[in-house]
Amino acid sequence: MKQQDMTVLAEFAYTIPALSHGYAGQTLYVDVGRGQISGRPVTEDMKERFIGGRGFDLWLLWHGVNDNTRWDSPENEIVISSGPCGGTSQYPGSGKSIAATISPLTDVVIDSNAGGHFGPYLKFAGWDAIELQGQSERDVIVTIDASAGEGGEGYVKIIDAPADCPVDTHVLGRWINDTFAETEPDRELMAFVSTGSGSNATRMGCLNFSLYDRKRRDLRYKQAGRGGIGTVFRHKRIRAVIVRTTRFGADTNGPADPTRIAQTGADMRREVTRWDPVQNRMRSRGTSYLVQIMDDYDLLPVRNFQFGAHPDTPLINGDVWEQRFTQN
């Protein structure tokens, strides 16, 4: 089915703002149950006290839920933010998104982070965070289209997921590319969040954050794996949240001191390039290197933080990952 033939359940138009000092100055609220979409201002007090990222997530979640909210309550929210440094292309790791919700595993607030391009693209689209609330009666897709660029008109829509829309991310990603991206550059400037059918059967569901790999000309995914946020996402009957932005550069984030940002970023890159191969080895092992280090220092959260180490750690540490799953 073509995008223009899909049933739009709710629509919200807005003017795409310029970013200033890492902020768009507004957050996006979407209630998939009631079909409500609105923008909410980011106050100076929010910036001063909570900065962004996890801070904004917790602030917005606090005001969205109540004392009786459980993970499967309609008023439970999933909040995603990248923070003021998100999308600063000079900095390694600035593609991170942080998501928060009330966990189906613990019934308390948790947060989880992931790479990919969704967080920065969300901000480039004019939003410092997104709140997803409510529970839909049908599977829906949330789209954020800011392809008109700064000063243009953007659109947020809740769309009825058509019958040919897959659930599982590895298939859904191809469908989204074919349906919402007309050209290769369109695919590079689009990112989405989804989960899979497995989240229907577990409270440990992950969120998948996409990025388009220009060299491979294909999608890759990063996971927010803590706390079962994907289970909450699927319970709300959201298939995907898609964001489209426009071309961006080193100054898109509106830094107060671009020269200092560039110099600091260059210093960080040199340090990572020099020391990562002999210290963390993140390039070859990813976050699996943390398993051994945390076990050595009695910090590994074994059995829900009852213990800090486990005798079987050598079976799943970075050495095993590098031997079994990489091409090094």
For each feature predicted by the language model, list its residue ranges.
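Intrinsically disordered, low-complexity segments enriched in small residues
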Residues: 1-113, 117-328
